[in-house]
């Protein structure tokens, strides 16, 4: 699927919802544009600020304009220069700050108050704490007994599409992108005439947990929005794992269709919502997902 097709899908879905489609290319540009490049090295800078991210550490460059253009084109740590064989102080501090940010989002918990504020039912996997979640991924693939009973009692049975939200390995991915992806996603699915299940939040969930959810609720398509493992300095990236008619015993990873890198600096959440709606419709039409879908 090329960019033109994606933009057509976005316009179509947003039009059916009675909303104006965003300009994806402009959104991406705005998200990745840095402030004016800074060449002076100062440890007083806020390492998470736009000024620190725009810092250029190459001394006496042959083509300063090339470095300036490169620095403005990405939020990656480029043009940092060297001090002999070693990184410059500012570059090292930014590296450590980005690493800390990524580590924090893995270890943080999604606040219970936030889940309640979104009006979501909260269930959890067999995991009871973050340390166990990181060391026992197998337990994150199954719901606890209380969660199974809660889903049977409080969720719509036999939906065409079931949407699930899980913290995964990035708390920020959920809390930052939620408002921009879930409302247009739910509205788009309903506008498509699909029976949509009750969206809910799974704490300490792994990707394969959607198989059990689909089996319990009898969902034709399960869409899991889960926090991605963060990269250095990028802690807000969300992934969508969609699967048709999942079963715990038979569904394998090749049966899933993944849309990754959903955030303002990658695929904008609103654009991703439109693409997911189109994907769900095609899965239902073809009765397949993953590598079994015709492209």
Swiss-Prot record:
GO molecular function: cobalamin binding; ethanolamine ammonia-lyase activity
Subcellular location: Bacterial microcompartment
Keyword Cell cycle attached: no
Cofactor (UniProt): adenosylcob(III)alamin
UniProt cross-references to Pfam families, sorted A to Z: EutC (PF05985)
The protein's enzyme class: lyase
Cofactor note: Binds between the large and small subunits.
Reactions performed catalytically: ethanolamine = acetaldehyde + NH4(+)
Role summary: Catalyzes the deamination of various vicinal amino-alcohols to oxo compounds. Allows this organism to utilize ethanolamine as the sole source of nitrogen and carbon in the presence of external vitamin B12.
Assembly, per entry: The basic unit is a heterodimer which dimerizes to form tetramers. The heterotetramers trimerize; 6 large subunits form a core ring with 6 small subunits projecting outwards.
Protein name (record): Ethanolamine ammonia-lyase small subunit
Organism of provenance: Escherichia coli (strain SE11)
